[in-house]
């Protein structure tokens, strides 16, 4: 099941089109958009396609420009950064092992939650400023215990260790808390995110209960609140 409401229809169509492209057959969807489609916790607007193999940057960039009218903003040895139909698309070689089976849901190839979670921990370790990375870990902990995430992290990135991941999760001085997160359901306060991360580090085997209100629940709650307000404004019975 995919939470398609987390991604604009045009973006979702573009993801499928890119992943059907034979030139991009070695790439898989990762990052926040993959997590949003799997978890349904927030909206996401970017497309991150990663491979664990080298690729010809010049050839792929040229193909994207011709086939998709991509506006390529920059390239690296193993990376392309571009916009397609105003959607930011990053195409990168991430040369670390894919540890779990690649999943295909509704034509979309994605890495496992464990693999993406390990990549999120690595991102926080080296750039702990992005609020959405902490939000994503908060939501992942409703599905996978931190112990499993850090074990995968350490296996994928053998030069780091679990303690480094714990330290990164608990260091928040660089987090840009003013960044806007478009949550699905209720907004999650920063203090609640911090509390969960702290508890997860202490109790690594915990899987946390979801504190989010799903859209259907939210609609039902609003209706109940309106009914309650109407009842509260009735005049006295005579």
Where are the language model's segments positioned?
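Compositionally biased terminal segments of proteins
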Residues: 1-238
């Amino acid at each position: 099941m995919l939470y398609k409401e987390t991604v604009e229809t045009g973006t979702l169509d573009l993801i499928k089109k890119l992943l059907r492209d034979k030139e991009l057959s070695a790439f898989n969807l990762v990052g926040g958009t993959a997590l949003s489609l799997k978890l349904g916790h927030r909206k996401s607007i970017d497309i991150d396609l990663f491979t664990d193999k080298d690729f010809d940057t010049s050839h792929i960039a040229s193909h994207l420009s011709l086939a998709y009218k991509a506006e390529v903003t920059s390239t690296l040895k193993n990376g392309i950064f571009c916009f397609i139909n105003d959607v930011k698309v990053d195409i990168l070689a991430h040369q670390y092992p894919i540890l779990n089976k690649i999943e295909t849901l509704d034509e979309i190839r994605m890495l496992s939650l464990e693999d993406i979670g390990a990549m999120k921990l690595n991102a926080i370790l080296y750039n702990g400023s992005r609020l959405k990375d902490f939000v994503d870990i908060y939501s992942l902990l409703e599905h996978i215990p931190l112990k499993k995430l850090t074990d995968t992290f350490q296996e994928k990135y053998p030069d780091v260790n679990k303690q480094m991941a714990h330290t990164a999760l608990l260091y928040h001085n660089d987090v840009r808390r003013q960044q806007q997160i478009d949550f699905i359901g209720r907004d999650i306060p920063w203090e609640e995110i911090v509390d969960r991360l702290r508890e997860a580090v202490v109790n690594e085997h915990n899987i946390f209960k979801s504190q989010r209100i799903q859209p259907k629940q939210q609609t039902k709650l609003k209706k109940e609140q309106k009914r309650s307000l109407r009842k509260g404004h009735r005049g006295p019975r005579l």
